[in-house]
């Protein structure tokens, strides 16, 4: 089917797309996507019975019993092409961002700032892959002024692929850290993969958003860009105001946030920079930042049983864990760290876990609790360090967290938020 004709049918569906037959919305266009453990083609009848207006299928086993079923060569590829075609038919300014750490937080901050003055859509949750990005683009409506799209990747070429689907007007990389080393091998691989976004932006004469405090990003300063910095060489200069929650100053204006951790400083600066660049009044930006609250176990500050808990269990890699430790160690009161294993590090895993243990040995932390097979394999004899293979071992131990401040962090698969319910409450 011609993509233009398919797009017309998509508009007939009030621009609603579904890929899960369990949650079909009335009048939607259902794409039968194949996954590792499922085949959407098997659920076409269910989707139509639940109210889908059209079903896009790519299996010969599906009988074309009426005009509602449309067969294509590849359902997923067609979804991606439809998203790109739809993006070209809108007037929305599209901002794409990627990076090793802080993508979701930065996306939400940018969305929060832009939404204070414009009609804006953004990637829902972490829908940042080859399926989520097209679904995000298909949210764009005729009156959407700005779209903030998050791009994720585990391997080389994925950012380039997603960028070509997205066709962004602006591109931003939050940072380069030791994430997904299973696919990227080392930090040089991470830089190569993430800069696929910047390379596309440059090739297509679009605009880079650069953090000049990052030496890798500053290498792109001779290309069309808007920039921010803590020095004097960027378009927007920021100063970090010390405190438990991040505040920054630009010129004589102070912007306050509810966000913990110095490592979120550049995320906030990027959002303010974009807001100012697009002409949003500083008072609106201040109000937007002040209203933003982190969710989903990302640098959340919780108070319970006389303790202040920094729950940063959304995900973890060596760079984000190191940054969290550096920031947390500056707290003056008694403090404890509870860390879970970091995943997707490939052959670097034990070495990176050992580096984290060594880093904590040099910090003034009262107690450190390490959970997971990899941390257990590199355990040390430090008397204030405690190692457990599993969370269950930790729960069953007599070890008690007595400190006033507690940092909890680990990879998503470790589900470190469960520590609160089982060991602190």
Language model region names:
Residues 21-32, 119-120, 131, 135-147, ...:
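Mobile, glycine- and charge-enriched loop segments
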Residues 9-17, 77-80, 128-131, 151-156, ...:
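Short gly/ser/thr-rich secondary-structure transition/capping motifs
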Residues 1-81, 85, 260, 326-332, ...:
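N-terminal leader/targeting and accessory segments in enzymes
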């Amino acid at each position: 089917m011609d993509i233009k004709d398919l797009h017309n049918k998509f508009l007939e569906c009030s621009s609603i797309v579904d890929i899960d037959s369990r949650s079909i919305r009335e009048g939607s266009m259902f794409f039968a996507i194949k996954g590792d453990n499922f085949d959407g083609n098997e659920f076409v009848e269910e989707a139509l019975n639940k109210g889908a207006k059209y079903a896009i299928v790519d299996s010969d086993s599906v009988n074309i019993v009426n005009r509602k079923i449309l067969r294509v060569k590849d359902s997923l590829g067609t979804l991606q092409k439809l998203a790109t075609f739809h993006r070209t038919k809108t007037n929305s300014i599209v901002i794409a961002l990627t990076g090793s750490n802080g993508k979701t937080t930065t996306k939400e901050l940018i969305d929060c700032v832009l939404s204070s003055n414009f009609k804006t859509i953004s990637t829902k949750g972490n829908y940042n892959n080859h399926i989520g990005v097209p679904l995000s683009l298909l949210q764009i409506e005729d009156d959407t002024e700005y779209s903030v799209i998050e791009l994720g990747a585990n391997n080389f070429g994925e950012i380039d692929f997603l960028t070509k689907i997205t066709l962004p007007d602006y591109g931003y990389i939050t940072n380069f850290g030791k994430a997904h080393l299973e696919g990227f091998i080392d930090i040089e691989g991470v830089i190569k993969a993430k800069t696929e976004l910047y390379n596309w932006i440059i090739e297509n004469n679009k605009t880079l958003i650069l953090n000049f405090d990052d030496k890798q990003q500053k290498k792109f300063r001779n290309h069309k860009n808007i920039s921010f910095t803590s020095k004097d060489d960027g378009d927007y200069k920021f100063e970090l105001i010390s405190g438990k929650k991040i505040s920054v100053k630009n010129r004589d204006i102070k912007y306050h946030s509810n966000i913990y951790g110095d490592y979120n400083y550049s995320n906030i600066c990027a959002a303010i920079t974009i807001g100012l660049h697009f002409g949003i009044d500083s008072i609106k930006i201040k109000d937007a930042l002040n209203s933003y609250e982190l969710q989903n176990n990302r640098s959340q500050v919780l108070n319970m049983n006389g303790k202040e808990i920094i729950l940063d269990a959304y995900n973890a890699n060596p760079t984000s864990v190191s940054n969290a430790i550096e920031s947390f160690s500056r707290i003056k009161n008694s403090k404890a760290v509870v860390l879970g294993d970091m995943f997707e590090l490939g052959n670097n895993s034990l070495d990176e876990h050992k580096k984290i243990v060594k880093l904590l040995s040099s910090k003034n932390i009262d107690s450190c609790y390490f959970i997971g097979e990899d941390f257990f394999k590199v355990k040390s004899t430090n008397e204030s360090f405690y190692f457990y293979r599993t969370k269950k071992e930790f729960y069953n131990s007599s070890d008690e967290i007595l400190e006033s401040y507690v940092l909890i962090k680990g990879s998503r698969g470790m589900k470190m938020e469960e520590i609160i319910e089982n060991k602190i409450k």
